[in-house]
C-alpha cells in the first residue's frame, strides 16, 4: 500500500512558465531549480507545464523535459507527478497524475494502467471533498487555492487556511495537501489544521536561494508532522 502521507510534506509544483525570470533557456531553468529543490528536501514534484509561457505548444520538447525531470527525481528517490496530461504520465511512466474536477475521471485513469499510479484530485469545495472521499481511486486531495495566487490562470475562489480544518471536522480522512499562495509563515498553521503537507510554486521558484528556502519549508512542515 502506498504511504501517501510520506510524500506530501513538501510538494513542489512547477513548469517552465514558473522559471522564465531566470533566463531564456526554459528547460535548463526548470532543471536547475528542481535540482536545488531536491537538494533542499522536497518530498514530491509535480510537473505542471502549461500556459503561454510554457512548452505546451512544443510537445516533443515538453516530453523531453518531463523525462529529464522524472530522471532527476528518481536520482533522489522523490515521486514524479504529472499534472493533467494522463497520456504523458503513462507514456513516460510517471509515478502519478494530478487532475482537476473537469479533467479525465479518476476511474478512467485507474483503468488505463495496472501499475500503482498515484492519483491526486483538486478540491475547492466541501461537497467535492465528500464525493472524492468515497472514490477509492483517489490517493490524496490538493486543496486550494488557500490564498490568492498568480501561478494559475483563472483561479477558483480562495479558501483560507481554516478550510483545511473544516474538511477534517466534516470527516474527510484522505490525505490533504494545501496549495495556492502558501508561504513559509503559513506552514505551521496548515499542518496544525490537518494538512498532511503544503504544495508550493513561487515560494521555491522565486527564492533568492532555492535550496535554503526549500530546506526551511521542509523543516517547518516536518516539525508539525503527525
UniProtKB/Swiss-Prot annotation:
Keyword Membrane: no
Single Gene Ontology BP annotation: thiamine biosynthetic process
Domain of life from the UniProt record: Bacteria
Residues that, per the record, bind 4-amino-2-methyl-5-(diphosphooxymethyl)pyrimidine: 46-50, 83, 122, 152
CDD domains (alphabetical): TMP_TenI
Segments forming a coiled coil: none
UniProt-listed Gene3D superfamilies: Aldolase class I (3.20.20.70)
GO MF annotations, alphabetized: magnesium ion binding; thiamine-phosphate diphosphorylase activity
Keywords from the UniProt entry: Magnesium, Metal-binding, Thiamine biosynthesis, Transferase
Keyword Isomerase attributed: no
A Pfam family that the UniProt record links to this protein: TMP-TENI
Binding residues annotated for Mg(2+), in chain numbering: 84, 103
GO CC term, one of those recorded: cytoplasm
Residues that hold 2-[(2R,5Z)-2-carboxy-4-methylthiazol-5(2H)-ylidene]ethyl phosphate according to the record: 149-151, 181, 201-202
Catalytic activity field: 2-[(2R,5Z)-2-carboxy-4-methylthiazol-5(2H)-ylidene]ethyl phosphate + 4-amino-2-methyl-5-(diphosphooxymethyl)pyrimidine + 2 H(+) = thiamine phosphate + CO2 + diphosphate; 2-(2-carboxy-4-methylthiazol-5-yl)ethyl phosphate + 4-amino-2-methyl-5-(diphosphooxymethyl)pyrimidine + 2 H(+) = thiamine phosphate + CO2 + diphosphate; 4-methyl-5-(2-phosphooxyethyl)-thiazole + 4-amino-2-methyl-5-(diphosphooxymethyl)pyrimidine + H(+) = thiamine phosphate + diphosphate
Cofactors, names only: Mg(2+)
Annotated InterPro entries: Aldolase_TIM, ThiamineP_synth_sf, ThiamineP_synth_TenI, TMP_synthase
Similarity-based family: Belongs to the thiamine-phosphate synthase family.
Protein's job: Condenses 4-methyl-5-(beta-hydroxyethyl)thiazole monophosphate (THZ-P) and 2-methyl-4-amino-5-hydroxymethyl pyrimidine pyrophosphate (HMP-PP) to form thiamine monophosphate (TMP).
Name this protein carries in UniProt: Thiamine-phosphate synthase
